[in-house]
Structure formats: C-alpha cells, structure tokens
C-alpha cells in the first residue's frame, strides 16, 4: 500500500502538469461611429405637399391623389401605410396656417378631399429688417448730440465778434457831436453885439 505522503505528492505533480487556464479575453466593443452633425433630415409631409403642388402648376388646384402620387415618386423611403394619416394632419395644419388654400371648385370639401392650392404665407423677412433700423437711428442721434454740444461754442464766438464790430463805429459819432455843440454858440454870441453898436454910432 502506498503511503499517504506519496499520494499527496502525486496529486501536487498532476496539478502542476495540468495546463493553466488562460483568462477569458474580454470582447472588444467596436466603437460606434458618431452620426454626422447636420445630416440630411427627411422633409415634413406639409413641405412635400407644397413641393408637389408647386411642381404640378395646376391653376384649379391639385387633387389629393395627384399629390400622393408625386410624393411617392419623388421621395424615397416613405411608409405608404402611414402616409394617408400624415397627409390628413398636414392638410389641416396647412389650411389653418394659410400655407394651403382650397380653390372655389372644392370650397365645400372637408378633410383630405377635393383639391388644394398653395396660399400666400406671411412674409417674415420684413420683420427682421424693421428690427435692424433702430441701430442706425441711435448712431444718428449720437452724431446729432455731438453737434449740439459743439454748436454753443461757435455761437458764443459769433456773438463776441458782432459786439466788437458794433462798438467800433460808435466812437467817431460821439466826437463829431461834441465839436458841433462847441462851435455853434461862439459864432452867434460874438457877431450879434458888434453890428448893433455900429448902427448907433452913425446916428
């Protein structure tokens, strides 16, 4: 009978000879490609309807069936089963906003029936132009305020020049008036008594 020490040694040798289990390799996750920013978005059903009506150029309006055919022919990847319900919502939205209008021939129609035309949408770019105008006015007001501040100095200089010009011509007039006042009484006082004395001596 083999001793128990030998059995333990044989077991340890068998364990050492057995190949080591390699650790399970972790599966590498393939990185997802980021979606390109600003990718091509699918147009809305209302925009597709407007494009179909403008392309067909029918004065009396385009029917719902003709619009549907044009959308399916010119737009790929559209689910035909959901297109009918999407068109109904788009027609209702377009009539409320004024983008779509019914012609006189289909005035009594309702829902997604009859024919449709493109209406006149409210012009948005005009509002943007009006918003920019106050900036120009503010720059003009600044220039006017700067001119108003500078103008009083010019007026003061003009007033001083006018006063100096007005004072100069007054000085010779005063001297001339004094000279005439002095000369007139002397001539009358001296001449008058001499003539009367000569007449009395002759008698």
UniProtKB/Swiss-Prot annotation:
It comes from Mytilus trossulus (Blue mussel). Keywords: Chromosome, Developmental protein, Differentiation, DNA condensation, DNA-binding, Nucleosome core, Nucleus, Spermatogenesis. Residues 1-35, 126-140, 147-203 have a biased composition (Basic residues). It is found in: Nucleus; Chromosome. The sequence of variant I is shown. PROSITE patterns: H15. Residues 41-120 form the H15 domain. Sperm. GO terms for molecular function: DNA binding; structural constituent of chromatin. PL-II* and PL-IV are produced by post-translational cleavage of a common precursor. Residues 1-46, 104-203 are annotated as: Disordered. Linker histones are implicated in chromatin remodeling and/or transcriptional regulation during spermiogenesis, the process of spermatid maturation into spermatozoa. Protamines substitute for histones in the chromatin of sperm during the haploid phase of spermatogenesis. They compact sperm DNA into a highly condensed, stable and inactive complex. It holds the Pfam family Linker_histone. One of its GO terms (cellular component) is nucleosome. This is Sperm-specific protein PHI-2B/PHI-3. InterPro entries: H1/H5, Histone_H1/H5_H15, WH-like_DNA-bd_sf, WH_DNA-bd_sf. Its main location: nucleus. GO terms for biological process: cell differentiation; chromosome condensation; nucleosome assembly; spermatogenesis. The keyword Heme does not apply.
């Amino acid at each position: 009978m083999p001793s128990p020490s030998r059995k333990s040694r044989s077991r340890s040798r068998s364990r050492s000879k057995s190949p080591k289990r390699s650790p399970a390799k972790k599966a590498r996750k393939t990185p997802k490609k980021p979606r390109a920013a600003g990718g091509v978005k699918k147009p809305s059903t209302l925009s597709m309807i407007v494009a179909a009506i403008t392309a067909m150029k029918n004065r009396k309006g385009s029917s719902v069936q003709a619009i549907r055919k044009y959308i399916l022919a010119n737009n790929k990847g559209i689910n035909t089963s959901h297109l009918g319900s999407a068109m109904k919502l788009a027609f209702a939205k377009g009539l409320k906003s004024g983008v779509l209008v019914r012609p006189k021939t289909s005035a009594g129609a309702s829902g997604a029936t009859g024919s449709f035309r493109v209406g006149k949408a409210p012009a948005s770019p005009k509002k943007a132009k009006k918003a920019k105008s106050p900036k120009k006015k503010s720059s003009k007001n600044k220039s006017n305020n700067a001119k108003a501040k500078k103008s009083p100095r010019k007026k003061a200089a003009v007033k001083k020049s006018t006063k100096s010009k007005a004072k100069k011509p007054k000085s010779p007039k005063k001297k001339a008036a004094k000279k005439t006042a002095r000369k007139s009484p002397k001539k009358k006082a001296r001449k008058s008594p001499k003539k009367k004395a000569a007449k009395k001596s002759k008698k």
